[in-house]
Every structure is written in C-alpha cells, then in structure tokens.
C-alpha cells in the first residue's frame, strides 16, 4: 500500500495533504544527489512538525516524532515519489530507464502494521487536540457552561436573593415617601400658635381646605425667597435735616464696570481695579451724589472688594445678589424697591437685561474687559457732573438720549469738545469786529474811536 493511499484511509483529505507535505520532501533527482546534506541522515536529529491550522482557524501544538518513526516515513516517501517518475522515464527514453534500473537502490520494504498503528494513534491525538482547541475557543468567546448542577443552584440562589432585596428596597422607599408626605402636609398645613399654645387665626381659618391653602402659601413663600428681593424696601429713608441728602442717586454695577474678575495660574482669582476709579469716586461721591453699589455678585465675594478700593467710604450703600429679582435666568435690579424718587435715579450698567424693569433710568455703557489703557471713567465722571450742575428735575430724558449711543461717555466728550470750540469762536468774533471799527474810523477820517 502506498503512502498516499495509507494516509487517505487514516486521515481526511486536508489532513492527508498536510501529512504528505511534511514527510515527502526527500526525493531522487535525475541530475544526481542533492548538494545539500539530507537532514534525516543524522540519526540523532529530531524533527518538530510546524503548527498546522485546521478546522475553523484552530491552532494545534507541534508534535515531536521519534527517530525510528522518521526513518520509516523516509522509506514510504521514496516509494511514493519514485513510482510515477519511473513511468515518465519509460515514455521519454528507454535508455534512461535502463540506467535508472541498474543504478536504483533496492526497493523499500512494505509498510508494516506498526506504522499503521502509529498513524492511527497520530490521528487520535490530532482529534483530541482539535476538540480541546474548539472548547477553549468557545469558552474564550464568552459562553458560560451551566452544565454543573452546583453552579446552576448557586446562580438561581443569587437571583432570588437579588429579587428579594429589590422588593424590600421598593417597599421601604414607597413607605418612606408616604410617611414623609403625610408629615410634610401635617407640618405646613397646621395653624400657627403663639407662645401660650393658642391658635393664631389667619385668612384660611374656618375653611375645610385650610391645611391645603397653608401648604400652597408655603410654596409661594419659598418661591418668593428665591425669586424676589430679600426685602421690600432696599434702602433706608432719605437723610433728614440737618443732614445733607444728595439730590440724585447713582446706582452702579460692580462687575465689569468698576472692577474686572481675572483668574490665572500664578495669582488665582482676583479683581482688577479699573483705571481712574479713584478720580471717578471723588467726583460722584458724597455729597455730590448718593452712590449705591447694586451688584449681581454675592455679598461674600463683592463686599471685601468694595471695601478694598473705597477706604474713604464714598459709597453710601451696598446691595448684592440677594436684593435682585431672578427672572428668566438673570438677576434683575428692581429700582422701584430702592425707596427713592425714580426721576432722580441714574442706573449704570452694561447688561440691558439687568435693567429691563426700569429701562428709562438706565445709562448703558460698554463692558470693561480688563484693558488698563481705558479712560472711560473720566468721561463718565464729567457727564455725571454735568447732570449734577444742570439741576434737572427729571434725569430720565437725558439718560434716554445718551443711551442711544454705544458709548455715552465718548459721545459726551465729543459734544463737549464741539461746544468748547464754538465758545472759542464766539469769543474771537467780537474782538475782530472791534478792531475793524477802530481802524476803519482812522482810514476814513473819523475820530470817534480814538478815545475808545
């Protein structure tokens, strides 16, 4: 039996090709023996089969073959390879066939039963490796083996325990919510009592739904605490005589008008003082104006900043975020709660949304972003000083006029320069006319202006 037929009977087609390829590399060449030494000539050499990929990409380890099995495989290869070559030589040249027969070595012995047993054992080992590789690949793919009865019982017990804990937690949460709601209604729906334990009557007393009305009123108070200013009257009453109460009140935003917040890795969070701020406060400070800081910043942040740049106490009052009205995500200043006449209130800010409740009192100026070459406060101080000197009974028309410009202070400066030039021209015109009259009298013989 030839080697190819033997392998086909013991292996599948793919495995037979692999086996023949591994053990059929030694053949007799017509050109003579190869120049390279046969590696199987060394009996002490052991050959390792390479890794062979078969069946769904599984990989099998190399198989170490003993020396005696290698020699038998060489004999099988020589028999398989020489038979077709001899037939081909018979067709091409009889002379070469005769020389081949005379010089060919004696035929190899027929395969014995031991070789067949080895091949069968090799096939069994390959099948075992294939099954082991398939199991390892299936386990690495994430499949779980629940065939173990103990493991299945443990999983079922864990699932039941989780269901029980979830059910208990839901019961506790639902019960706690019910108890909390009842306690809330009882606490905020009860009538108030005085120090002696007597019930204080309110507008809801005597009604069957009085507890629910009181609960709704509590919600309204919470909303007002967040949305509305902290008190109805933000400023105290004007100063009585003999103290001097300024005629006009200036309400000014702190952030990005007088100072600018800045954060760096080196200094951290700090506020930059705007150039000419001291001059600005000297011009508008008491007793010229009643200055009020009305900022959307918190008192904890803004109060120390105001105290640091105003050691002379030129700012009379300070109002912070708790005194603003929260509307549509913005902190709005409600000037109607200042306890002052709005016809004499000047509100200075860069954000139009902050003064949306009183736009006629707002003087909108550009936002200062920290540039240290800014001189807008000087021009703004001159504008406010002009309003003070005008002694107007209602400042709102002037504020509305200058608010139509992007930079009211710059527009005021431009108009002030223009008016000063007009005044200079008016002063020069009478001098020129008097000189002409004086010289015209001399030219025409008139002596009326000699003594002038």
UniProtKB/Swiss-Prot annotation:
One of its GO terms (biological process) is protein import into mitochondrial matrix. It is a single-pass membrane protein. SUPFAM superfamilies: HAD-like. One of its GO terms (cellular component) is TIM23 mitochondrial import inner membrane translocase complex. Residues 243-387 form the FCP1 homology domain. SMART domains: CPDc. Disulfide bonds: none annotated. The chain crosses the membrane at residues 168-188. It comes from the Eukaryota. InterPro entries: FCP1_dom (IPR004274), HAD-like_sf (IPR036412), HAD_sf (IPR023214), TIM50 (IPR050365). Residues 189-452 are mitochondrial intermembrane. Residues 96-115, 130-153 are annotated as: Disordered. Pfam families: NIF (PF03031). Residues 131-144 have a biased composition (Low complexity). The keyword Transmembrane helix applies. It is found in: Mitochondrion inner membrane. Residues 1-23 form a transit peptide. Keywords: Membrane, Mitochondrion, Mitochondrion inner membrane, Protein transport, Transit peptide, Translocation, Transmembrane, Transmembrane helix, Transport. Residues 24-167 are mitochondrial matrix. PROSITE patterns: FCP1. Belongs to the TIM50 family. Essential component of the TIM23 complex, a complex that mediates the translocation of transit peptide-containing proteins across the mitochondrial inner membrane. This is Mitochondrial import inner membrane translocase subunit TIM50. It comes from Caenorhabditis elegans.
């Amino acid at each position: 039996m030839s080697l190819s037929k033997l392998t086909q009977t013991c292996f599948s087609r793919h495995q037979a090709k692999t086996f023949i390829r591994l053990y059929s590399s030694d053949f007799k060449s017509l050109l003579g023996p190869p120049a390279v030494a046969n590696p199987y000539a060394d009996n002490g050499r052991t050959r390792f089969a390479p890794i062979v990929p078969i069946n769904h990409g599984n990989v099998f380890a190399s198989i170490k073959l003993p020396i005696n099995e290698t020699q038998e495989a060489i004999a099988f290869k020589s028999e398989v390879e020489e038979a077709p070559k001899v037939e081909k030589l018979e067709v091409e040249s009889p002379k070469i066939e005769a020389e081949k027969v005379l010089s060919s070595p004696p035929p190899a012995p027929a395969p014995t039963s031991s070789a067949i047993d080895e091949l069968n054992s090799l096939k069994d080992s390959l099948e075992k490796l294939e099954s082991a590789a398939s199991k390892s690949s299936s386990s690495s793919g994430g499949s779980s083996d629940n065939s173990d009865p103990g493991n299945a019982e443990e999983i079922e017990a864990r699932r039941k325990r989780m269901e029980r804990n979830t059910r208990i937690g839901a019961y506790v949460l639902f019960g706690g919510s019910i108890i909390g709601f009842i306690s809330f209604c009882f606490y905020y729906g009860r009538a108030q009592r005085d120090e002696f334990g007597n019930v204080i009557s309110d507008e809801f007393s005597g009604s069957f739904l009085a507890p629910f009305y009181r609960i709704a009123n509590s919600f309204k108070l919470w909303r007002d605490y967040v949305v509305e200013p902290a008190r109805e009257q933000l400023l105290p009453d004007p100063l009585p005589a003999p103290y001097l109460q300024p005629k006009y009140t200036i309400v000014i935003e702190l952030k990005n008008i007088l100072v600018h917040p800045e954060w760096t890795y080196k200094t951290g969070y700090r506020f930059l003082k705007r150039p000419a701020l001291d001059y600005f406060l000297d011009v508008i400070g008491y007793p010229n104006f009643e200055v009020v800081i009305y900022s959307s910043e918190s008192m904890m942040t803004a109060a120390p900043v105001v105290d640091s740049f105003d050691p002379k106490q030129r700012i009379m009052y300070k109002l912070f975020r708790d005194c603003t009205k929260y509307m549509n995500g913005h902190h709005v200043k409600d000037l109607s709660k200042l306890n002052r006449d709005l016809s004499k209130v000047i509100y200075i800010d860069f954000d139009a949304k902050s003064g949306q409740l009183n736009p006629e009192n707002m003087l909108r100026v550009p936002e200062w972003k920290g540039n240290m070459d800014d001189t807008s406060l000087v021009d703004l101080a001159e504008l406010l000083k002009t309003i003070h000197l005008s002694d107007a009974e209602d400042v709102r028309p002037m504020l509305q006029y200058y608010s139509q410009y992007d930079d009211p202070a710059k527009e005021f400066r431009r108009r002030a320069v223009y008016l000063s030039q007009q005044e200079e021209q008016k002063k020069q015109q009478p001098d020129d006319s008097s000189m002409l009259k004086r010289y015209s009298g001399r030219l025409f013989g008139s002596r009326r202006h000699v003594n002038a």
